[in-house]
Amino acid sequence: KKTAQKNTATTDKSILDQIIRVDHAGEYGATRIYDGQIAVFGKDSKIGKTIQHMADQEQEHIDKFNELLVEKRVRPTALLPLWNIAGFALGAGTALIGEKSAMACTVAVEKVIGEHYREQQDLLEDDEKELKKTIAKFEKDELEHHDIGIAVSYTHLRAHET
């Protein structure tokens, strides 16, 4: 007796590895940017609390990608030491210029990460439904951060106009 096999598409291992490696690096860089901004603004300032909220979500993202690196046997990028220093420096540097600059950095970074997530969902096949769902949730978080950055910048501009 023959059993019917499901015709389910599988994601190419090299594509899967690339997605996880790139996303892990991006989330790591984002956590370091927020660490740099918080180092300047502090956790207790109004902007610091806003940044901490976004940083907490980014930490959830990096934790998940750390799990996926092990689960899917993917090596992280060799550039993590660079992301560590460059991310913190970018965050601290933009924060030193001011809240508006820090939020402009957030808007730009989160826009790029959100676009990557949208594109990656199209590359994942049926065998990676869970990862696709995770990436869709993270994309939503990144777009929220993008919108927070715009809202804070707009509020900051309006305060200076009056």
Question: What are the residue ranges of the model-derived segments?
Answer:
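Amphipathic alpha-helical coiled-coil segments
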Residues: 64-66, 148-153
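Active-site flanking loop/helix segments enriched in acidic
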Residues: 12-24
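Conserved alpha-helical segments that form or flank metal/cofactor-binding pockets of metalloenzymes
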Residues: 47-82
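Helix-loop segments that flank and shape redox-cofactor active sites
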Residues: 6-14, 30-52, 71-74, 113-129
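Acidic/histidine-rich alpha-helical segments that form the ligand environment
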Residues: 23-26, 30, 85-144
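Conserved small/polar residues in nucleotide/adenosyl-binding loops
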Residues: 155-162
